[in-house]
UniProtKB/Swiss-Prot annotation:
The keyword Cell division applies. Interacts with gamma-tubulin. InterPro entries: GCP. The keyword Aminoacyl-tRNA synthetase does not apply. Component of the gamma tubule complex that is required for the regulation of both interphase microtubules and mitotic bipolar spindles. It comes from Schizosaccharomyces pombe (strain 972 / ATCC 24843) (Fission yeast). The gene is alp16. Its main location: cytoplasm. This is Spindle pole body component alp16. The lineage of its organism: Eukaryota, Fungi, Dikarya, Ascomycota, Taphrinomycotina. GO terms for biological process: cell division; cytoplasmic microtubule organization; gamma-tubulin complex localization to mitotic spindle pole body; meiotic cell cycle; microtubule nucleation; microtubule nucleation by interphase microtubule organizing center; mitotic cell cycle; spindle assembly. It is found in: Cytoplasm, Cytoskeleton, Microtubule organizing center, Spindle pole body.
Length: 759
């Protein structure tokens, strides 16, 4: 017959029904037996019977597949009834959709070929049974007709084990089978790539992997295909579970944002995944379609895998930021670039916000977060790092002028908007935002009150915000899981347009504002003109006063050693004090008040210099520049200035010595040598004054013009900060030329002194 009932099991076609007392009425079974050999009537009976309305194996459109999948074990199993144990290795996965096509049923007798191919009863049973699968290729039974009304297209040994058992009873096998609807299997498989464990695929905490049962098969799909999909899904699910566990803790601010990006990305991926499951049913696409959908997130999985490997290195701070940038750069021109750039943007924005705030606080308050500026990311251009270094150096020099900051802080506030852009449109929007951006409207305080002493609480608040404590409520924007890179902004353009240019503009604007203030308060150009062209000694009256002072200390002294001895006495202090007084009086004559003249100081230092070890070691002229002007003076420039005017001072000393020696001589005796010496002395003296009044201004002219061109109101706005560095370099060249010229004069003077001694 087409349906065989044995031990409360009904075998009909490719369905197996458990006929427990609560399942079917005996009248129904009796009625069913009357239709033996009449397939169509029997099917109508099944379709119209009220007993099948609540039966678990009725046709359900939500379930995929149409056949029975069996997992058989040859061990002695116990029935799966309440109170009895059931082996977890044996499963029956059943789908209820009937086969619509009519199929010729073979007689219940076993064909001779199966009798010859049958295996002995003591052999192990094939542990996989795949019913009505046209692609079954095991045991060379591919695309064969069903050989039994009970099981379709089963391997021969399994078939023989069922039919040639002692009493033809499958009860010892099938009574212990666990029944899983096919939808349950699909749900478990769909949960794998989301990182969800299930009873079918449990999570092994020891090995941190999903446990896969190789005995599970799906009809309509080869074992190899199903196994590959399950392995692929389990690998993705394991990656997600590891990522959620690994990135649950963070050690630095940037690592927090990286963790937040990955965790929120996983949540968005799961949301998109479940949305696809709702919109596209399995019966339309199946596991193959689901696998293709998961492939669209391959770049996100690659990013997770990449950072899971590198997380063991415990990257921190800027090293992690550089690592994010390097990863995004390595992904350029690939489908992984969009998601890598989004990760870089999200994780780097807090750093750029902190950099903006640090520059803002530095300019408005004079506070400098050196740790932030000394550890700039490697992807910053070298020119940008130099500009920032010069700006910080400039700030460190002028932050002592608190009165200037408190009075003119609004002049130092400039717009700044630095962060990476995702697309070309974002760059255009950033330019618009930068034009209308005003730092005074931001949330970190009212910048009109910038006195550190009066607003200490506000200043401390700003410093606390510079730490950029992570916000746990920070929600990640909707990620773009796309492989379209046509409108995605390249990294080089990102760094140039979104990082370098805004910072360069900010620094240049700040320097312009600073020099504008200095021009109004310090009369910077008058000071520079005075400093570069005269340096005190161009004025004849001042020079005569200095020479007279030196001569007064030389009178009644026989030689230079006595002068040195006298300078080491108490009179030395009076001498230096009077010389400083002359210097200060000269500066006041040039319109420099007592407070503003502190920017440039001239001191006498007793430290010996190699050039002057034998000539007046106690008279060393030291040039110092304090404040905003210091950025225009390199260390070499200051050294050249000190040496230059030390030479000048010693030339004056030599002149005073010669004049004193002439005055001490007997005037009645005028020799030819004395006349010649006096003539040479006058020539050297004239050369010295020409050097001070003509050579120095002409030599400093290139630097003076360059400085005025940079900071004049008509200066173009696109001048980069490198112009300031160039001006300082030109300044150094000018001072070097001046130093070489005065050294020639000094050498000439020494030759002249030698000639006098010889004569």
């Amino acid at each position: 017959m087409d349906g065989i009932m044995k031990n409360d099991l009904l075998w009909f076609g490719n369905h197996v029904f458990d006929l427990t007392p609560n399942s079917f009425d005996s009248d129904f079974v009796e009625q069913l037996s009357k239709f033996e050999g009449k397939e169509g009537l029997k099917r109508k009976l099944f379709d119209s019977s009220e007993y099948f309305q609540n039966f678990s194996f009725q046709v359900n459109d939500d379930l995929l597949g149409k056949d029975v999948i069996l997992d058989i074990s040859n061990q002695q199993l116990t029935p799966a009834v309440p109170g009895c144990e059931t082996s977890s290795n044996s499963k029956l996965i059943s789908a209820s959709k009937e086969i619509t096509s009519e199929r010729k049923r073979a007689k219940s007798s076993v064909s001779p070929s199966y009798l010859t191919d049958s295996s002995p009863s003591d052999l192990s049973v094939e542990n996989k049974v795949l019913l009505t699968c046209p692609s079954w290729d095991g045991e060379n039974f591919k695309n064969l007709e069903a050989r039994s009304p009970f099981i379709s297209e089963a391997p021969s040994r399994v078939y023989d084990y069922f039919l040639h058992n002692q009493d033809w009873s499958p009860k010892p096998l099938f009574s212990a089978l666990q029944v899983y609807p096919l939808a349950t299997i699909f749900n478990c498989v769909a949960g794998l790539p989301q990182g969800f464990e299930s009873t079918v695929f449990p999570w092994n905490k020891t090995s941190s992997t999903f446990e896969l049962d190789p005995t599970i098969s799906v009809s309509g799909m080869s074992d190899e295909c199903f196994a590959s999909i399950v392995q692929k899904f389990s690998a993705i699910g394991g990656l997600i579970k590891k990522a959620l566990n690994e990135f649950s803790l963070y050690k630095t601010n940037i690592s927090f944002y990286l963790s937040n990006f990955i965790v929120n990305g996983v949540l968005q991926y799961r949301k998109e995944f479940q949305r696809w499951l709702r919109l596209y049913e399995f019966r339309r696409f199946g596991l193959i379609g689901l696998s293709n959908f998961v492939n669209s997130f391959s770049s996100f999985f690659e990013l997770i895998s990449h950072f899971l490997i590198k997380s063991a290195q415990n990257l921190k701070g800027d090293s992690l930021l550089d690592f994010l940038f390097d990863y995004a750069r390595s992904c350029q021109n690939t489908i992984s670039y969009p998601i890598a750039l989004q990760c870089l943007i999200y994780c780097s924005n807090p750093y750029f916000k902190r950099l903006e705030l640090a520059l803002k606080v530095s300019c408005a308050y004079g506070h400098i977060d050196s740790s932030l500026f000394l550890s700039l990311p490697r992807f910053f251009p070298s020119e940008l790092c130099v500009s920032i270094e010069q700006c910080i150096q400039f700030l460190s020099l002028i932050r002592e002028q608190k009165e200037i900051f408190n009075k003119n802080n609004k002049e130092f506030i400039n717009p700044l908007n630095i962060r990476f852009a995702y697309s070309f449109n974002d760059i255009n929007q950033a330019c618009v935002i930068e034009e209308r951006c005003n730092f005074s409207s931001l949330s970190f305080g009212n910048l009109e009150q910038t006195s550190v002493n009066n607003d200490s609480e506000e200043f401390e608040t700003l410093l606390a915000k510079m730490n950029m404590t992570p916000d746990f409520n920070d929600n990640l924007l909707q990620l773009k899981f796309t492989d379209d890179v046509r409108n995605v902004c390249p990294l080089n353009l990102n760094v140039c347009c979104c990082i370098a240019e805004p910072i360069q503009s900010f620094i240049l604007s700040f320097l312009r504002s600073t020099y504008k203030v200095l021009k109004n308060d310090f009369q910077v150009f008058d000071l520079l003109n005075f400093f570069h062209s005269t340096f005190l000694f161009q004025n004849y009256e001042f020079s005569d006063n200095v020479i007279s002072l030196l001569k007064s200390r030389r009178l009644d002294k026989s030689d230079r050693n006595e002068l040195a001895e006298d300078l080491n006495s108490d009179d030395r202090y009076n001498f230096i004090s009077r010389l400083k007084k002359f210097i200060f009086m000269e500066k006041e004559k040039n319109g420099l008040s007592r407070s503003l003249s502190k920017s440039i100081t001239f001191t006498l230092d007793s430290a010996s210099v190699s050039e002057f070890e034998d000539v007046y070691p106690d008279l060393q002229f030291q040039c110092q520049v304090i404040g905003a002007l210091r950025i225009l003076f390199t260390d070499n420039s200051l050294n050249y200035y000190s040496k230059t005017f030390s030479y000048v001072l010693h030339l004056f000393q030599a002149q005073s010595d010669f004049e004193s020696s002439v005055e001490l001589k007997d005037r009645s005796i005028v020799t030819k040598t004395t006349i010649m010496s006096w003539s040479k002395y006058q020539g050297t003296k004239e050369s010295l004054f020409q050097f001070l009044s003509i050579y120095i201004p002409e030599c400093m002219l290139p630097f003076t013009k360059l400085l005025k061109s940079i900071y004049s109101p008509d200066c173009p706005t696109n001048i980069q900060n490198s112009a300031i560095k160039n001006a300082a370099s030109v300044h150094e060249q000018c001072t070097k030329a001046i130093y070489q010229k005065v050294k020639e004069l000094f050498d000439t003077m020494k030759l002249w002194e030698s000639s006098i001694k010889v004569s």
